[in-house]
Structure formats: structure tokens, C-alpha cells
Amino acid sequence: MPGNNTGYAKGVYGIGVRQDLFPGETEFFRKNPHVAGMAAEDNRIIMNPYSGLTDAEKQAVMLNEAARVHMRVGNFDTPRFTLTPEQEKAFAGYSTNPTDRLSTVAARILSNDPSALTPTPEQIEYVQRLRKFMGVK
């Protein structure tokens, strides 16, 4: 599992994984099998037991969600880069909070998720710093 060789004591890159889902989370995941996992409100990573991801895909999702928690709780600076017009359009419905949109784009770039679309040099620089902070190779 990622995180075991980064200097963090537990979890995925220092963020805990919660196996037991709360009732609302279970229902959400059951209705949304396309949502692979999330950074839960308790700042733990939760995975969707109804998604059909491979182990490698699950690892990428956990990396993505760990990065989002680090940004959310202030362990790493909040992204302040600009989204491209294509990213603005693609993530317009993701959240009403602009920081959530920036954080998800950064985390998706970090985990090599193509849904982040084409990153700008500013986004790449931010993600390189995030990668170094998290100890991601």
C-alpha cells in the first residue's frame, strides 16, 4: 500500500483509510458506483465497495484522496493556480467551492487521472511540490 515507505506511520501517505462506511456513505456509493472513493468529512479516505476498480486503480484513487485531505486540512498550501477554460467547464458541477475544484484538479494531476485534462505549467509546478511533500515517487 502506498505510504508505507514514505516516513508516515500509517495510512496512505499519512491519511487514514476508514473501512467502515457510515449509512449515508453506503447508500451514496451504492447509487453512484462510478464514484471510486472520497476524502470523507472526517478526513479519512473511504472507498466505494460497489466500484469495479483494479487494485492499481484503487491505489491511484487513494493517492488522489490523500492529497485532497492534505490540502483540505492545511498540511499543504491551498492551490491558487488558474484552471483552463476546459477545466472550468469540466468541473463546473463538481462543487460550488472554487478551492474544491482546484484541489481535485491538483489531486487528479498527481494521480495521473486524465480527467484533470491538460495541466498548465503553473499546475504542474504546484503538483511537483505536492508530490515532494507527500513523498510520491
Name each model-derived stretch:
Residues 1-14:
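Zn2+-dependent metallopeptidase catalytic core
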Residues 5-7, 37-38, 94-95:
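A general structural signal for short secondary-structure junctions and capping/turn motifs
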Residues 13-59, 66-72:
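Active-site scaffold of zinc-dependent metalloenzymes
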Residues 17, 29-33, 56, 79-137:
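Metalloprotease/metallohydrolase-associated module, dominated by Zn2+-dependent proteases
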Residues 63-64, 79:
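General N-terminal targeting signals
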Residues 67-75, 84, 111:
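Active-site-flanking alpha-helical
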